[in-house]
Amino acid sequence: MSDDHAYQAISAYDQRLIQTPNIDRIANEGILFSNASVTNSICAPSRAVILTGKHSHLNGKIDNGKPFDTTQVTFPQLFQKAGYQTAMFGKLHFGNNPKGVDDFLILPGQGSYINPKFIGKKKDTIIQGYVTDIITDVTLNWLDKKRDKTKPFMMMYLHKAPHRPWWPSPEKFAEYYEKEFPEPETLFDDYQGRGSASKTAEMNILTHMQYMHDSKIRPETLESMGQVQPEIKYIRGESVVRPGPNGFMGP
């Protein structure tokens, strides 16, 4: 799961600005969803809806500040009860630890892009590096070395990116310097010079999507592990921030 990206940031849906071949492969070899609804487009409430299958007024998570009600049943608990080995790595943003997972390493709240702190099942730790790379490495290590290969598994791989502040690796940002981005009709309505600023921001967002998600766990990585044959690989966005006219942005 990624954070705050729109469907246009995946080239399986829109090829004008960005290429995400690894995500596209999942779409091409599986199912590409063309119809969707958003029950809540705020970070933690959206995740609560996804994990519980209940609307926000039923699961009680209506904002990012109030802790999640841990008496609510989440789908990892159901997998765990059914005999699956369960794990969760990345951003949860619930204000408390997840239930129904055998192993977890999650960011506190929103987390940091650089040298982030993590909350673990046994202890908290600070890991040096870039958060997207760290979450990916932890996930791959669990798949390869910590997973009980005699059991089916359910693993949640949850990225912080591309949530603001949009902070890609510097070497990746340059990939979009020469790309032309279409400008909306209202771009220059209010103040001069917005073109270059808007273009820079969009390059930043698209770089987040390509580098932080498409270039991470490739389908062939799972295949190379041989015994890893997940029945379902599911990628989705948790919520989206949409640029609007006259400088406004919102869910």
Model-inferred region functions:
Residues 1-251:
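Formylglycine-dependent sulfatase
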